[in-house]
């Protein structure tokens, strides 16, 4: 009779719920074997669920590639709501049929996974472009217009020219066919890829700003109005990267 450890090692190689070995060892009444079988079944089911989720997330891209488009860029931004720092946009072109495990709306990805998934996107993408508009531009033109400018800059930085755009809840006045998708970062893998690239890029920038302007906890809050950030504003006043048209910064400046 095989040991529990031997069975566990063999189970690691099983990739289908219908595998005969899985059915065979399920009859083994030892509790260690039963636990190993259940664990493997759950892992296989999780893989199947993830593959199905990713299939759903590439449906826009799949239809467009089947229609003859050859370079589809997903575009998204991060940083519309913070009191400080830039708004950052990214444009990403993934290869046709590309699936990246764990890639989702960046707000749904655990923080500890951000770097890993960002790197997977950077490794697999055919092209990546990044655009940012700082607080001065945000104050000058408003956050909505600054977001569009950041997206257009990200688009212009792509080393490969896209022939179709999938954009998260926004339309751009550019001569490229496009679709605006509500909650795009949860429904299109290309937009989700742009979302995590923009998120990690902005978080790194804010961590750098934290060293330049200590006291606001920018490395932790990325410029959002947390308790520590607001306390920093009260104590140190307004920094050069604060958005002067955003409350409570605006009121502090009189």
Curated annotation (Swiss-Prot):
Respond yes or no to whether keyword Transferase is given for this record: no
Q: Which residues form the signal peptide?
A: none
The free-text note explaining how the cofactor binds reads: Manganese or magnesium. Binds 1 divalent metal ion per monomer in the absence of substrate. May bind a second metal ion after substrate binding.
Parts forming coiled coils: none
Report any one BP term from Gene Ontology: DNA replication, removal of RNA primer
Q: Can you say where in the cell this protein is located?
A: Cytoplasm
Q: Identify the PROSITE patterns for this entry.
A: RNASE_H_2 (PS51975)
Q: Which UniProt keywords apply?
A: Cytoplasm, Endonuclease, Hydrolase, Manganese, Metal-binding, Nuclease
Catalysed transformations (reactions): Endonucleolytic cleavage to 5'-phosphomonoester
Q: Which domain of life is it from?
A: Bacteria
Briefly, what is this protein's role? Endonuclease that specifically degrades the RNA of RNA-DNA hybrids.
The name of this protein is Ribonuclease HII
Species of the source: Streptococcus gordonii (strain Challis / ATCC 35105 / BCRC 15272 / CH1 / DL1 / V288)
- The gene name reads rnhB
